[in-house]
Regions:
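Bacterial N-terminal signal peptides that target proteins for export
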Residues: 1-9
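Bacterial Sec-dependent N-terminal signal peptides
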Residues: 11-36
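A short beta-strand motif characteristic of beta-propeller blades
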Residues: 32-40, 79-87, 126-132, 172-179, ...
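Beta-rich, blade/repeat-based domains predominating
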Residues: 41-54, 88-101, 133-147, 160, ...
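Residue position within the beta-strands of beta-propeller blades
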Residues: 58-60, 106-108, 151-153, 196-200, ...
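Short loop/turn segments immediately following the C-termini of beta-strands
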Residues: 62-63, 109-112, 155-157, 201-203, ...
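A short loop-to-beta-strand structural motif that recurs across blades of beta-propeller domains
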Residues: 68-72, 106, 115-119, 161-165, ...
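Short loop/turn segments that connect beta-strands within beta-propeller blades
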Residues: 74-79, 120-125, 167-171, 215-220, ...
Length: 306
């Protein structure tokens, strides 16, 4: 079992404290172990998502012929990944999330001039365009608390970074928040209260570059939760299944991989060393289990944390 190290206290916005207690008795504690699940047959994975029960992982990567591909793999160690969808319209899949019923995968794809939000059946089959308009180069994607809308980070047509809401059926994207302090937002999680937790590589916070922001459902502000986060590419963030704790793949000051967790109520930050990982990137918790799917982009490996 890897050691968790208390590293800091951060200032959680007062309006958010107490709003994220455990849901339905689900686990809210940060992960304490990281275990290798799968490698081989794919390269450069970007993001992963767990099935609601945590037994199956889905991830975006490139296959051995360098085609962008969506894969499925058991969350058990030593598993072999199976391709679900490959090639067009997938170009540069960066963000991945699953519908609440586990039937559909939604993809934020930054490829081409404008990028696109795509959808694909989790059981396998071709990806298709969702038909979302008004968002350019989506990077992070998350399911909304009502399961009827998606949230995505991306750009306005003039290049302004923004957070968007998009119906799961497609259509016009609604701007939730735009502009500073957002700079290059990617990783995204939206909790049961509609608060968006956004990872931003280049944004500046009190402790340095690399910021976790909290944006309330009304889009009134983007508050710094933690900064000086040496996140992977793309940055990932997910709350525990029961809420209460935000978990992010990062690196320490020496460049060593770790999972950084922030207790939303207290601001306590802990780090879980992940010495086998090289470039921790995307991460997502199971909806109904204390399991996280984690990708190592550089090493081409999928891990589970719990």
């Amino acid at each position: 079992m890897a050691k968790r190290l208390l590293v800091a206290l951060v200032s959680t916005p007062a309006a958010l404290i107490g709003c994220h207690s455990s849901d339905d008795g689900l686990p809210s504690d940060p992960p304490t172990t990281v275990t290798k699940v799968s490698s081989g047959g794919f390269q450069s994975p970007t993001d992963a998502v767990a099935s609601p029960d945590g037994k199956t992982f889905y991830f975006a990567a490139w296959d051995d012929t360098k085609q962008p591909t969506l894969f499925q793999v058991s969350s058990q160690p030593g598993s072999t990944a199976t391709p679900l969808a490959a090639g067009d319209p997938l170009e540069a899949p960066i963000g991945l999330v699953m519908s609440c019923d586990g039937a559909t995968l939604y993809v934020a794809d930054m490829g081409g001039e404008a990028g696109a939000i795509l959808q694909a059946p989790a059981a396998g089959g071709a990806a298709t365009a969702l038909g979302a308009t008004g968002i350019v180069r989506p990077g992070g994607i998350a399911m909304g608390p009502d399961c009827k809308s998606l949230f995505a980070t991306g750009l306005l047509s003039d290049g302004t970074p923004a957070l968007f809401e998009v119906p799961v059926a497609g259509g016009a994207a609604r701007v939730v928040y735009q502009g500073a302090p957002l700079t290059s937002p990617t990783g995204l999680h939206v909790d049961s209260q509609g608060v968006a937790w956004v990872m931003d590589h280049h944004a500046q916070g009190p402790e340095g570059a690399g910021v976790l922001f909290a944006i309330p459902a009304d889009g009134s502000t983007a508050d710094v939760v933690a900064s000086n986060l040496r996140m992977g590419t793309p940055g990932g963030v997910s709350l525990t299944a029961g809420g209460g704790t935000a978990v992010m793949p990062t690196r320490d000051s020496d460049g060593n991989a770790q999972l950084t967790s922030v207790d939303i109520a207290t601001g306590t930050v802990t780090n879980l060393a992940a010495p086998d990982m090289t470039d921790p990137a995307g991460l997502r918790s199971a909806r109904k289990a204390g399991v996280f799917a984690v990708v190592d982009s550089e090493a081409g490996t999928i891990y589970r944390a719990e």
